[in-house]
Amino acid sequence: MKGTIAVNLTNGFGNNIFQYSAARLLAEHLDSDLVLIPPTKNYYGIKELENLGIKFVEKKLNNPINVIDKNYKMCYNDVLKGRDVILSGYFEDYTIYFDKLDQIKNWFKPVKNRKDNSLTIHMRTGDRLFMKNEFYTKPRAEHYLKAVEKFDFDELHIVTDMPKWDYVTADELNNMKFHLDVPANERVPIGESVKFFNEFIEGFEKYNPNVQKRSIVDDFNFIRASDNILFEHGTLSWWAAAISDAKKVGVYGPWRPWKGDKNKNLSNIPLKNWFKWE
C-alpha cells in the first residue's frame, strides 16, 4: 500500500514552491502519494499554484510521522516506504534541490524564453518597506544600480508588488495595502520608507523601466522567461531564476542578514550563471 507525503503550506507563494518541491522530491523517492495542505480553505495561493499545474487532493493520513526542516534529509530512507509523513517547515536549503533542478523544472508548465536581451529585476517592496527588523540592512538603490552595471541588456523590466512605480508621499504609502500588515511598533518612521522607495524611482529613471501589474503566477513566469535576472532575497524570484534558462542571474549575497545564525544558504547555490552582489 502506498504511503503519503503531506506538507503544510504556509502563507507566501515563494514559500509554497519550496514546500511543494521538498514534499514532491520525497514523495517520488519513496513512491508515495503527495498531498498539499493549505493554511486556510480560502487561501489565495491555491488558485495561483493550480495555475502552475500543481494539484490539490485530499487524503486521510494514517498515524503520520511528523517531519520538520532539521530532520527532512533523514527521510530519504526506504524504511519509510508505505508510511504517511507530514512535513512542516520552509525547507529553504539549496543542497536539497541543487542536483535535482532539471527534474523539478519539468514539474512546471514550460515558458518560452523571450530572448530579448532584457534584464528583469524582482523588487519586493510593499510590507518590507516598513519592517524595522530588516530595513536598516536592506540594500539601497545605489547598491542595486551597481549590480545592474554587471549586466549587458537592452531593456529593463521591474517586477514589484508596489501598486505604482512613481514617487510616493507619506500619506500614499500609509494607505497602500500589502502582503502583510506591519504593527506600528515594528515599523520604521514613514519618512524613511518614503525616502528609501523614492531613491529607487530617481535612480532608475535613466533606464525607463517597464513596470506592469500582473498576477503572482504571471510575475513568476515573466521572471522565468528572462535572459537576465536580478533579485535580492525573494523565494519566488529564487525559484523563478533557478528553473529559468537565464544567461545571467544576480542574487544578493548576504541574503537576509538580519536573521543572523538563522539566515539561509540560498544565495550560495553554485550555479555557473549566478553571481552575488552586495
Walk through the language-model features, giving the residues of each.
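A structural signal for short, well-ordered beta-strand segments and their strand-loop junctions
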Residues: 6, 33-39, 120-122, 157-159, ...
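Nucleotide-activated donor-dependent transferases that construct or modify glycoconjugates
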Residues: 1-11
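Secretory-pathway luminal glycosyltransferase catalytic domains
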Residues: 3, 39-153, 161-166, 172, ...
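A short, glycine/small-residue-rich beta-strand->loop->alpha-helix junction that serves as a flexible
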Residues: 9-18, 136
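Acidic, PIN/NYN-like endoribonuclease modules and their adjacent C-terminal/linker elements
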Residues: 263-278
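Donor-binding and catalytic core of enzymes assembling or modifying cell-surface/extracellular glycoconjugates
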Residues: 13, 154-266
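Histidine-anchored nucleotide/phosphate-binding helix
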Residues: 16-28, 144-148
